[in-house]
Amino acid sequence: MSLNFLDFEQPIAELEAKIDSLTAVSRQDEKLDINLDEEVQRLREKSVELTRKIFSDLGAWQIAQLARHPMRPYTLDYVRHIFTDFDELAGDRAYADDKAIVGGIARLDSRPVMIIGHQKGRETKEKIRRNFGMPAPEGYRKALRLMEMADRFNLPLFTFIDTPGAYPGVGAEERGQSEAIAKNLREMSGLRVPVICTVIGEGGSGGALAIGVGDKVNMLQYSTYSVISPEGCASILWKSADKAPIAAEAMGIIASRLKELELIDSIVPEPLGGAHRDVQAIAASLKAQLLDDLSELDGLNTEELLNRRYHRLMNYGYC
């Protein structure tokens, strides 16, 4: 399977191409006198070493590219690897079923829970069907319906954030995009069940916040969380999207910076090369984090949970 190497990974891509070429030759002619296995192993070790070197010093813009990687696991990938008995629930009961938001009831180690997350697509048709992970108001109202259901049936709520932002189309604005987001922010802050949010890719502005008010907020190592995309910021400040790398650094969009600012609680480490390199490994790491978070929150009664969440929200932006 192609790993779809990014621009800054091209030296790794060249090594991997050599490995693939030698492996193919070895399979085609097993009578070769040259021991290709040793050479392939040497190149693989060199590739791992080079990958480790490159990924030890990534900038914010490079991490932003990883957060958008086309092979990066999406919400439904994590649902398959972490949860069982997932039963998807559709529709906002008012207008439509927005495929950019998925959600439903599942089990986490046999415990019933509610799941809500953004969902992007991989192939062209799927990307269009999912609107590139940009929800319309009906998506956020579907999410609200599931939040209220979780509250009613005392189900812990897990949200997975991965969106460039809420859909900015005219129709979405006419149907009340800002109202839908604002209502979710208000209602999530008062849910009487544990709410655990994880940024798994792009955490874009209000579109991310609309399912991001929680008792615990985690970020994967190579995810981003920001009020605007680096390109959008650069276009406003410098009138050119080419300045996106500068904007990414200045905005502090990466997990380590947000942890320093106490805007998130935990950073989930990713496999070498990013989550797409080993989906099972990142899913196992994330599951362990979610279980730890849930175990901690289970020790709080409803009043303690709400008070803690309130103080968390009130401390945002406080110096």
UniProtKB/Swiss-Prot annotation:
Keywords from the UniProt entry: ATP-binding, Cytoplasm, Fatty acid biosynthesis, Fatty acid metabolism, Lipid biosynthesis, Lipid metabolism, Nucleotide-binding, Transferase
Main location (coarse class): cytoplasm
GO annotation, biological process: fatty acid biosynthetic process; malonyl-CoA biosynthetic process
GO annotations of cellular component type: acetyl-CoA carboxylase complex
Location of this chain's protein in the cell: Cytoplasm
Top-level EC class: transferase
Assembly mode: Acetyl-CoA carboxylase is a heterohexamer composed of biotin carboxyl carrier protein (AccB), biotin carboxylase (AccC) and two subunits each of ACCase subunit alpha (AccA) and ACCase subunit beta (AccD).
Protein name (database record): Acetyl-coenzyme A carboxylase carboxyl transferase subunit alpha
Organism name: Sodalis glossinidius (strain morsitans)
